Structures are given as structure tokens and as C-alpha cells.
């Protein structure tokens, strides 16, 4: 009762300056811009925004950040999928095979139709590289504003939308890899450049109190930073991105909200930042989040009755108020799987 009274009459109730002078970057959701945001993104959004608000209330200088993965293999598949659907519109579906590993959703067909409506059939005569570059650009120009709109509806306002492509275009990924090489943490094998992740992790775990015997029993593996074809891996870009946060932009700490399926990546990224002298083991904080199961009438719901597609954030917000959704997502620890009861939330 006291808290409710204070919230109504004392706008600054509970605010402290304990975090004064410390700058925290809180990165959350960061969904691939290749399709609509899903239930897992909804949980990460509620958790990340709540955590950022708490840090802000405790006096920290907080930046809410969304990392847009607009480079790499996922975007290549995205462009390839739109391109195939576009060519099917122009040349006939029976004449253009769809790539097996492409994105099969109706949203890809809608993007291809949108591109066709704007540009007509003329792009069929362009080179595949030129055509797919245009498809990626068009698809992102449609999807990213939709993501921003959905997140604003979800009462999340970001301070920074950071494009992965800027790290590659500026040479920052290559520079970061060269720094690791200069510190002796890389080696070449089979034409590729590898990070000695095994040694970095061993040193990290020993510093954290593990014995040599315990460390020797771990199944550790090294990571490719630059493939034999000259392209940098997602891990190399991720190291560069977090170096950008901790070194170039000077945040005291970087806090990331990740799905629990990325747990194997946590120590590796921290260790790589340790190798750069950035104390990643202490300055990079990863909050892992378990899956969400949507229930209706006590049964799992995987598809939207309205659209026939997987449940997206916007579908959820058509059924449930924003405050109810955010409350439910934060009602259990992020380390526990969450059953989201749609009937209860609507009531």
C-alpha cells in the first residue's frame, strides 16, 4: 500500500544515485530483421526494458540498444528467398525453384510482391548479385520500421539502433581481428584464421577458481574468425560489436538479454574480450532467458487463428493489453520457462 501511495504522490520515490557516473549499455530483443518478432522476443523486450528502467532509477546512465543483424548469412538467405519469390512472380512458379534452406513464410511472398509492384518485371534481367542486393535493401526497409512500430506499441523506446553492417563497412571487424592476432591469440589453419578460444577459456576459468584438473576435463574448441573465402564470421563481428561498446563508446558495462539457447556463447565472448584487454569476464553481463509457451484453453497455441502463421508480438498485442503482457513476462525468473496463459491475461 505504501508503495502504491508513493507512486501516486511522489514521482521520484525510490530513486537513488548509487549508479552515478557509471554508463550501462542494455541490449535486448535484437531480433533478426528477416521476419516478424515472436513470443521469445516479447519476453526479452519486457525483461530488458524493466532491467533498464531499474538501472536508470538507481542512478546509472543507461542506453537501451537494439543490434540489427543486417549482414551475414541470414541476410543472404533473406535476399535469396525474396529473389526467388520475385522471379516466380515474373517467370511463373513452376519455372523457378525455391531454395530448400530459404525462408518459406508468407511474409517473404508479400515482400516479393511489394518489390514487383514498385519495380515491375525489369529486375529479372539484372545480375543475381545486383538483384539480391536490391532485395535485401528493400526487405530491410520494410521490416525494420515494422519492428520499430511493434516495439513502440509494446512501450519500448530505444536510444540506439546499431547496424551490424557498419562494423564491416568501416573495417572495424577486420581491425578487431588484427588486434587479437597482434596479441598472439590467433593462428591459421586450412586457409582460415582461428581464435585460440581454448587457451583464452582455460585462462579465464583458472582466474575464476577452477583447478587445472577441472579445466583439462572441459571439452573446449577454437573458433573461426575469418573463413578461407575471406569472409568474417558472426563471432568475429560479435567480438567487434562488444569491443565497440566497451572501448570505443566507453560503457562501464554491457548487459545483454539472450535466449538460453545461446548459453554456450557467453564464456567464449567474454574470453575473447579478455584477450583484447577489456575485462569481458566482468564488464559483459549476459542474462539468459528461457522459452515461452503460449496457452489457450489449457492447450499450447503455436499458430494465429487470424493469420495462420506463428504467433508474433503484434498478434499477442491484438489480444492482450501491453501492461498485462509485460507483467506476465516478468512474473517469473528469466531462468524458468514461462507458460503464458492467454485466457488469464485477457481477463
Question: Can you annotate each of these PLM segments?
Answer:
Residues 1-347:
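NTP-dependent nucleotidyl-transfer catalytic core
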